[in-house]
Amino acid sequence: MSIYFISDIHGCYKEFKLLLKKSFFNDKKDFLWIAGDLVSRGPDSLKVIRYLYSLRKRIKIILGNHDLNLIAVYSGVKENKKENYFDEFLSAKDNLQLINWLRCQSILKIDEERKIIMSHAGISPKWDIDTAKKYALEIEKCLSGKNYSSFLRSVFNNKINYWNLNLNKLDRLRYSINVFTRMRYCYPDSRLNLICKKSPNLVKYPLIPWFKIPNKIPKEYSVFFGHWSSLIGTKVPQPFFPLDSGCCWGGKLTMFRWEDKKYFFQSFQKNNS
């Protein structure tokens, strides 16, 4: 039994299936951890979701910002846009079943035995592991509940970029969503910058990659995350493992096998249909 990690599939079904074959993933005995953004940008979001649903006993999924966007579009909270490639999903007969499954997935995964953490974007430098688990669970309860559309209607907010214990519940949820699904850069005081998406090689102080801010994560933990394709070519310190290599932008998909610490790659296929 092996554990594989991947992120930011973004509807690139063809590349995803090729990478599973290349990495010798066995859907009868192995496990696949996916750090979010299953959908959008690429052409085959519905195929990706259906395939993952068929593997649901062998996978652990973290929701990313694009997955939340799909749920919001489906529920009428957000407008569908051409670049989402959601039309096929929205007209599918099984979309309710798939949405109800998707919105019950996690925001954070932690394996305390193997010392593994997985988040789509990262973990606030202000939080220890227990705090991160607490606020991830708070989001998960809202998403999996019957009033999930009301939650999504109120939770998206760029202005909540700081953490303190006096935040009201809604602002706490807004901050937590931003951390887990959208964070890239922080200021030295750990405030979030939710605008800049550039490579750290092109960005100057006071913007600092979140994983270079002093944090409260125990040193023995490995942290897997996606969301940030422009990290390609940037030296990221251990124990952080970025997985987004920009397949939907013409880059590649990256997969990491835990047991032997081996990477596998699959380049974008130009004739992707």
Swiss-Prot record:
Keywords assigned: Hydrolase
InterPro entries assigned: ApaH (IPR004617), Calcineurin-like_PHP_ApaH (IPR004843), Metallo-depent_PP-like (IPR029052)
Alphabetical list of Gene3D superfamilies matching this protein: 3.60.21.10
UniProt key word Secreted: no
MF GO annotations: bis(5'-nucleosyl)-tetraphosphatase (symmetrical) activity
Catalytic activity: P(1),P(4)-bis(5'-adenosyl) tetraphosphate + H2O = 2 ADP + 2 H(+)
EC identifiers of the protein: 3.6.1.41
Pfam families cross-referenced by the UniProt entry: Metallophos
Top EC class of this enzyme: hydrolase
Family that this chain belongs to: Belongs to the Ap4A hydrolase family.
General function of this protein: Hydrolyzes diadenosine 5',5'''-P1,P4-tetraphosphate to yield ADP.
Name under which the protein is recorded: Bis(5'-nucleosyl)-tetraphosphatase, symmetrical
Native source species: Buchnera aphidicola subsp. Schizaphis graminum (strain Sg)
